[in-house]
Design a protein with these regions (language model features):
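Catalytic activation segment of kinase domains across protein kinase-like and atypical kinase folds
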Residues: 182-221
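Hydrophobic "anchor" residues on beta-strands that sit immediately upstream
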Residues: 11, 69, 172-174, 194-196, ...
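ATP-dependent phospho-/nucleotidyl transfer catalytic cores
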Residues: 15-26, 75-95, 106-176, 181-195, ...
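Conserved ATP phosphate-binding architecture of protein kinases
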Residues: 1-7
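ATP-binding pocket architecture of kinase catalytic cores
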Residues: 10-31, 37-111
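All-alpha amphipathic helical-bundle segments outside canonical DNA-binding/catalytic cores
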Residues: 253-266
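Active-site activation/catalytic loop segments of kinase-like enzymes and analogous catalytic loops
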Residues: 208-250, 266-274
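Alpha-helical transmembrane segments of bacterial inner-membrane membrane proteins
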Residues: 53-57, 113, 124, 238-242
Length: 274
């Protein structure tokens, strides 16, 4: 990702698209174009949604020398935090993601491309784990026996969201799928949420996938912290995020009681994956 500054002082974000992870670049950019153009009709704030800069051929990206590139307008007077400095920062990230959900409530989610198939299909992640355990290619499974037993004991519970989606008990929605604090831009002066960024993983799914925000933001240590005595879940941060998210997304009624399950499932899914 580059900051490009023109002679006139106009600033842009130039990004190389990760075509190794996202093989269908055209589908990915169709998703981003459709979602950002839809959001543009719902807000009067030019900083309230990312703005793609089209090529001279009116395309949303450029393919050159075996690489794919895209450009956004730079969102001026904004900041991006890696970790919340205050509870209000975390609250505002919840407002950002909740607003994103609310504004896209009537977007036809089924029309979106699945840029990473089965990304938050937790039962499928368990299937991959079981296959790997059976092969045990590095002969390390015995070293983490207790952790494996912990995960497998909760396998049925962790299928709740996917089962509810399949049964039609939860609505299919536009989901961001990477709802970390650093994917919400805040106003540099007021610290209020402006817009959601990093839209590569926007796909159809359940709003409960936003529970990944809790896994990341309510943790008392970095996700790669090796000293596990430092790692807990802050219930206060959980309350702060839930309050901001629900207030920003009053249309989120179906599955409201499953919000805590979203946080549990996304946390377990991460553990099963890695």
């Amino acid at each position: 990702t580059y900051l490009a500054v023109t002679e006139s002082g106009r600033r842009y974000i130039l990004q190389k698209i990760n075509s190794n992870t996202f093989r269908d670049v055209a589908g990915l950019m169709e998703n981003i174009t459709a979602v950002t153009e839809f959001l543009r009709t719902k807000t009067d704030d030019p900083r309230g949604v990312l703005t793609l800069v089209k090529t001279h051929d009116s395309a949303s990206y450029l393919h050159a020398q075996d690489a794919y590139w895209r450009t956004y307008d730079f969102v001026e007077d904004s900041i991006c935090l890696q970790l919340p400095e205050t509870d209000e920062d975390f609250y505002q990230s919840a407002v950002g993601f909740g607003t994103f959900q609310q504004l896209l409530t009537d977007f036809p989610a089924a029309k979106l491309h699945e840029t990473i198939p089965n990304f938050h299909n937790t039962p499928d992640r368990y299937r991959a784990l079981l296959e790997t355990l059976e092969r045990d290619p590095m002969h390390r499974a015995a070293q983490v026996r207790l952790e494996i037993e912990f995960a497998l004991a909760r396998q049925a519970e962790m299928a709740a969201i996917q089962n509810a989606l399949a049964a039609g008990e939860l609505p299919l929605r536009v989901t961001h799928n990477d709802t970390k604090l650093n994917n919400v831009l805040l106003d540099a002066k007021t610290r209020r949420a402006l817009c959601v960024i990093d839209l590569d993983t926007v796909m159809p799914g359940s709003s409960l996938y936003d529970g990944d925000s809790i896994r990341f933001g309510a943790a008392t240590a970095a996700e790669d912290e090796k000293d596990l005595s430092k790692m807990e879940m802050s219930l206060e941060r959980f309350r702060v995020f839930t309050r901001g998210y629900v207030r920003a997304c009053p249309g989120l009624t179906a599955g409201l009681e499953l919000l805590p399950m979203g946080a549990k499932t996304m946390t377990m899914e991460c553990g099963v994956r890695f």
